[in-house]
Amino acid sequence: MLWKLRLFWDRLELGAIGFFAVATLVIGSLAAAMLGVFADRDARAKREREYNAENIACLARNVYFEARGEPLAGQYAVAEVTMNRRGWGPFRKSVCAVVYAPGAFSWTGMRRLPQPGGKAWDIARSVAENVYWQKRAPTLPGARYYHATYVTPGWAKEHQRLAKIGRHIFYR
């Protein structure tokens, strides 16, 4: 096989300079193709990191505004409900789409919200990361609804009550 290539090259009468020119083009093309593959992989990994960070931030804000001041178990339960809604029914695939779906969580309709901060924000971020990355076993599998104990929404009768944690009642 190699002798055929050599014979072909000799017929072209390009000599050593031609050989090196063609070799440089071939090697350069291969290098550019490989660089493109690795650059695409790096860009995809960066987009995935940004997507995950954005979803964790949305989940943390939801935990903060819905369950700040609740027992830790209640904050985890709110995060679980949020994650359970992802990809289900009227909700989309991203956590942010679930959190900001119209009417899904009361705080998203408020015009002025305090900037999250302090120890409560640190706890909310920790809870969000643990639930998002599934570092903790769910305590309310299948829970998709909850409400505060001081209200009785009409939809509550249609769903199975799972637990009361802090000032929230959770349903499947």
Describe each PLM feature range:
Residues 2-9, 15-18, 36-172:
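Bacterial extracytoplasmic/cell-wall-associated proteins, especially those involved in peptidoglycan
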Residues 16-34:
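Hydrophobic membrane-insertion alpha-helices, especially the h-region
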